[in-house]
Amino acid sequence: MEDIRRFLHTLYGLFEKGTRIRGILGCFLGGLFLNIVIELMDRQSLSAVFVLLESHPLAFLENVLILTFSLSLCLFSKRRWFFGILIGTVWLGLGIANLYVLSYRVSPLSAIDFAILQLDWSFIGIYMSVPAFILLVIAVILLLAGLVMLFKKCPKSPVHRLFNTAVSVILLCACIVIPYLPTSLGFGENTYTDVIRLTENYGFAYTFTRSLVDTGIDRPENYSARRVRAIAAEVLRTKDKAPEDVPNIIFLQLESFFDVNRLKDVTFSENPVPYFEELKETCPSGYFTAPSVGAGTANTEFEVITQMNVHDFGTGEYPYKTILQETPCESIAYDLKKLGLASHVIHNNTATFYDRNIVFPKLGFDSFTTLEYMNHVETNEIGWAKDKILTKEIVRALSETEERDLIYTISVQPHGAYPEESETADIKVLSGIEDPALRGQMEYYATQIHEVDEFLRTLTDVLTTWEEPTVLVLYGDHMPSLEISKDMLDLSAGGLFETEYVIWSNCGVGGADKNVKAYQLSSRVLELLDINVGTLTKFHQLNPWRGAYETELRTLQYDMLYGDRVVYHGEQPFEETDMRFGTRDITVNTAYVQNDMLMVRGKNFTPYSVIYVDGNAKETTFLSEYAVTCAADGIEKGDRVTVRQVAEDGTELSEAIADPYGD
């Protein structure tokens, strides 16, 4: 007993007199507290936090140590209290942001979300109410004011740099080593990069930190020129193959679209998707495994276009925001150019989201038609463009070129966030959903996909009579960001990662139903068309989708993007295209002053057309596709007047062509 008393006395003395021990102990306790609070917000259940502790104790410790390490950085400043509270506030802010993100989608917050975030009024209006935004602004102002006061008033403490450095290095090394310890010790297998599974099994702090540093495809252990040649031997030997009459190929990526009839015991006032169900019965179809749930449109897009597996990249990574910012990548657009197809992208949303305006030239596309180049666009209740505008744009793209076309179309109408109360929800949930909020969201969603279903019927009616052979590939990019659990789905009809695809044609394309992953869809479509061109098209078509297939695909992907490009004989064979925006020229015919207003006349103007005078943007009023106007204040004879298409975030996309002789 005396020994225990002496030990406790010694420990107390260290705590009382040893500021070094107190500092690091405070960081550890702060990290433990932060981890419990952040996990509680993420899992919304204290018992679920303890399940993480019980099932993956090392993972729980890893999160605590990551937070402890970040807090330990405050010990290098005399104002350790201020910087400790500041660092803790940042982590709490991330936890709150994650809680908010999870209120309208399934996947947790990751570092890439800050790269793709667009804080314009259209974004705020969809995902946040005006009162909530005002409260957020007030909270941020109060927080900043509080931090300023704290900085002025917090006491100063001595800095023990050598000790603090040693402790921080030990903490950092522990954070790096723990994930690589044997799974039997309690961390578990963490080779996958899906943020949903990682956060669920290993915690938010670990997953978020990993998403900050984990990008690209890791070099395979056995990577070598010999290994790549062995994998690609049959691909390199196989000659390109295609029929003499290659059809138009249209991919139609349907935002958050799935057949709600897959929901168990849920009945609606009418079938929301009768035509889609008819297509599934009469056309080649199957389940389509998306790389994510409730979000991640760009990654589904990336997989279909490039035929690469995004899960081979970093944690939560969007290749659009990393490697494709600088590097061209082989794609179906590049491959089908060999067969003479012009390539287009059509999207009834802004051009700059996910940096598509930067990425698509590096994927080989010739044109990109976006919301900024469309007229007469109707919007739904929460502001997303309705998909029926796409019929006109698809027909226009087919008509504007003499050659056959590859058209990659991206819809947006059923996008979240879904309102709990809707003024436009015509389809009602009759049974199966008791929660009023989810029922209201489901009724809104069902109404939106019903309109999409009608758009699909209209589009196929138009394409049925098109004079050229045309193939239309329909699929949902991912499940909607609704609180749909596995228990609500008929799992015999696919899980949370599965939507469905259909291959329709006006030229009798047939084939057996087959389930695919997103990166296998293009090769599946081309196989039915007797087309075999391109590295990964051949690889997917020539290999059974089992065994070493996934590992070999990963090696090829690494070689093509990050390695020695052995498969391309050491060269980069793909050049960024000179992609144009829209399929029709926007022209300026004349500009003149009338009644103190500058009137600009031309062709193909849209509500996103902005008048520029000597390079300066003017507040512009859209009158029609033939005329735009602005105040003539300060405009003098000889000033250069032009019109540019400007995205919602202010990015200038293109400039009108001067055509003084236009009719």
Question: For each predicted feature, which ranges?
Answer:
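Solvent-exposed soluble domains appended to multi-pass membrane proteins
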Residues: 236-244, 254, 259-663
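N-terminal leader/auxiliary helical segments
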Residues: 3-16, 20, 24, 132-145, ...
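Membrane-interface segments at or immediately adjacent to transmembrane helices
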Residues: 178-251
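Transmembrane and membrane-interface helices of multi-pass
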Residues: 2-198, 637-640
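Membrane-interface micro-motifs in multi-pass membrane enzymes
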Residues: 111, 196-204, 294-295, 385
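Alpha-helix initiation and N-capping motif
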Residues: 114-117, 201-206, 225, 273, ...
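Residue-level preference for non-acidic, small/hydrophobic
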Residues: 120, 249-254
